[in-house]
Amino acid sequence: MSITSIPQPHETNEQHHTEIQHHRSAILNNDLVVLISIAFSALLYFIFDKDNFEKNPCLRLITTLFPLSYLAAQHLLLFHTSWKGNNKPEDTLHKALRYFFSALFITFATIFILSIIILTNDNWSKDDDPLFFSIVLPSFFIPPTYLLSISCSLVPGQTGFTDTGINILIDVLILLCFIVNFIFMHEKSKYRLYSAVTFPLLVLVRLLTEKYYPSGKSSLPTTTWRVVAFVLIFILVIYTYTDMGCEAILTLDYYFTYLTR
């Protein structure tokens, strides 16, 4: 055997280090996009008044475009990860799981694209609508997808929760923010605003800790508690976005019925 065919340890270590750096870079970029999406929508709310949102569909489009585009794009990336994440032969269960993930993520991406159109065509006529759509809604819909894409592995056979160290605490706090937002979603409560402000702050903390004190990822995401954590996050994703999809379908049905009269 030629000596050139023997794997060199330093090459393997260098490749592993490169993969870790690439993964960290992807996480940091994801955090930045989340912060920009939320901050931009919130900034528009403070710049313009209610009449501007009600009369200007372009302003409504710009306000919802960033957070909902992030969600649509992220689900397409999750689809790509679940579909291309494993080149090894699969058994029937893993193959079925991969097809289920892929179909679900494509569906959710479509829902968010349709939601951009629906929210742009809505008049935002209620007094609370600009605040709700520009600040409350992004901080409600983004956390489940954020946790699924940052804290979990979707590779068949390695599916589970992967965060370690301080990031686990941050994930728990993000989940609590989501639950608070869910409880007070349709109420004019100060608690939903607290949650809407806390979530981007937690993302910022995570970005800084990942940049300067990275915790790394677990090499055993399939341990029992990690699988349970993944299932909990995934259930939140399915419930939240299925409900949104039903609302989108009902709204589209109303529009089509109105147009055909």
Curated annotation (Swiss-Prot):
Residues 1-20 are annotated as: Disordered. InterPro entries: UPF0328 (IPR019081). Residues 11-20 have a biased composition (Basic and acidic residues). It holds the Pfam family DUF2463. Belongs to the UPF0328 family. This is UPF0328 protein ECU02_0020/ECU04_1700. It comes from Encephalitozoon cuniculi (strain GB-M1) (Microsporidian parasite). The lineage of its organism: Eukaryota, Fungi, Fungi incertae sedis, Microsporidia, Unikaryonidae.
